[in-house]
């Protein structure tokens, strides 16, 4: 029989494991701060220097550029991270890196083709082609950083340091070089230049340990197929959070897009503070579900309790504080953004719900196909509602389209788990934990 006494060696190992998890969480939150919270430092400056119309053009170009980032990144930060983490030897890691690199070359070509089509088909982009191309190219370069590799070897701090450094330098350059609406393309040029430097540094770090191979295109296509489920989810999710300014710009003037963009940046930065926790816990949940399904369910419940409570608090703060927040961050010219911010605050609990039930549970359980169906349906609903509401209700109509489609995604995930008796809150799983 084994005694109930835990030795100092085991206690030390557990403490080190918990410290590593905490360190990863801090590192991922550092990246997220650069991605979401740092714009709150630059947006007050840009909103006052550019004004609603120019900010709307920047928001629309950036939203389309994010489509390019989404296409090139594809979801490798999850699919390739998992493969790197479970690779058996250096040769396998080298093959994964080569396959991802090949896939990103193919995807970059697709993103550039889409940008060329948009430059011809979208009136605002025809009038401002430089803004479009600088936005697209900068976002593509950002997606080339091999963050998946550093996540896979549990060196999240390296990716975090590179990303944060690039964004801080770009932010400083923005204050120095952007002085009026005509300087708007410099915003994307700064982002692209700093991203290119971090891309080079990241690949130098990788090359010191592994030989960089020329990709085999067959393996690149296999990598694309394996990451398809995550790409679909991230595509739908990013339409809710990043691509809406572009969609609105198809139906509304730049000033209206500016009102929406300002409120969306505030909402995304605030609500987005919840997502890094899911990013860190995903690989741990994937590992835990193989050894103890009930423990994995318990961790999912606990995470949802925490994120659910925080998301409700965030939503209430955004709703009640909208006038003060908008005036403080955007300025007096953006009063119409107050209503948009209130509407978007309603999506906070829905985002927490989809992050946990989607990333941390559905995918971990291998329900990629169901995941795809839910996200594609939600994406179609978002697009349909945008087409119906944006022409008539402008920026507030777009905000409602986002909230409704996000809610449908959350309910769809819950219903799927309930029907399959995999709901982590079910009595059966709770009793198994008792």
Feature map (PLM): residue ranges:
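Interfacial segments at transmembrane-helix termini and the short loops linking adjacent helices
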Residues: 119-135, 320-349
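Interhelical loop/hinge segments that connect adjacent transmembrane helices in multipass membrane
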Residues: 6-21, 184-187, 191, 200-242, ...
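Membrane-water interface segments that mark the loop-to-transmembrane alpha-helix transition
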Residues: 24-35, 61, 66, 70-119, ...
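Helix-terminus/linker motif at the lipid-water interface of multi-pass membrane proteins
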Residues: 40-55, 176-180, 238-269, 287, ...
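Helix-loop junctions and terminal segments of transmembrane helices
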Residues: 73-89, 101, 267-292, 358-364
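Hydrophobic alpha-helical transmembrane segments
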Residues: 129, 133-136, 160-208, 264, ...
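Signature of the first transmembrane helix
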Residues: 3-4, 20-77, 171, 229-255, ...
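Membrane-interface junctions at transmembrane-helix termini in multi-pass inner-membrane proteins
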Residues: 129, 139-162, 348-374
């Amino acid at each position: 029989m084994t005694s109930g006494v835990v030795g100092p060696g085991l206690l030390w190992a557990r403490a080190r494991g918990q410290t590593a998890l905490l360190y990863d969480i801090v590192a991922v939150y550092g990246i997220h701060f650069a991605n979401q919270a740092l714009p709150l430092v630059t947006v007050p400056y840009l909103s006052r220097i550019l004004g609603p119309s120019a900010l709307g053009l920047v928001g629309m170009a950036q939203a389309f550029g994010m489509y390019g980032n989404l296409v090139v990144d594809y979801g490798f930060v999850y699919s390739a991270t998992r493969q790197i983490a479970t690779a058996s030897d250096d040769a396998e890691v080298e093959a994964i890196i080569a396959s991802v690199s090949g896939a990103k070359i193919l995807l970059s070509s697709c993103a550039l083709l889409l940008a060329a089509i948009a430059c011809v088909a979208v009136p605002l982009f025809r009038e401002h082609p430089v803004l479009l191309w600088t936005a697209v190219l900068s976002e593509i370069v950002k997606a080339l950083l091999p963050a998946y590799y550093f996540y896979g070897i549990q060196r999240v701090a390296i990716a975090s340091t590179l990303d944060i450094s690039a964004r801080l330098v770009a932010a400083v350059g923005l204050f120095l070089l952007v002085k009026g609406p005509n300087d708007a393309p410099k915003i994307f040029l700064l982002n692209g230049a700093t991203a290119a430097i971090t891309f080079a540094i990241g690949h130098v770090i990788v090359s010191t340990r592994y030989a960089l191979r020329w990709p085999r295109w067959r393996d690149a296509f296999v990598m694309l197929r394996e990451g398809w489920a995550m790409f679909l989810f991230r595509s739908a999710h990013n339409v809710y959070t990043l691509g809406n300014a572009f969609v609105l710009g198809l139906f509304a003037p730049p000033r209206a897009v500016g009102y929406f963009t300002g409120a969306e940046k505030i909402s995304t930065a605030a609500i987005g503070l919840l997502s890094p926790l899911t990013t860190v816990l995903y690989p741990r949940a994937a590992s835990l579900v193989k050894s103890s399904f009930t423990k994995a369910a318990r961790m999912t419940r606990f995470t949802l309790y925490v994120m659910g409570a925080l998301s409700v608090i965030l939503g209430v703060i955004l709703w009640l504080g909208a006038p003060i927040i908008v005036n403080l961050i955007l300025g007096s010219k953006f009063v119409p953004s107050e209503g948009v911010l209130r509407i978007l605050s309603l999506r906070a609990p829905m985002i927490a719900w989809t992050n946990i039930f989607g990333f941390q549970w559905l995918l971990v359980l291998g329900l990629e196909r169901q995941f795809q169906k839910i996200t594609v349906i939600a994406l179609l609903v978002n697009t349909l509602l945008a087409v119906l509401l944006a022409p008539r209700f402008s920026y507030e109509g777009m905000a409602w389209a986002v909230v409704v489609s996000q809610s449908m995604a959350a309910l769809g995930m819950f219903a799927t788990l309930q029907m399959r008796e995999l709901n982590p809150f079910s009595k059966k799983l709770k009793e198994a934990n008792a």
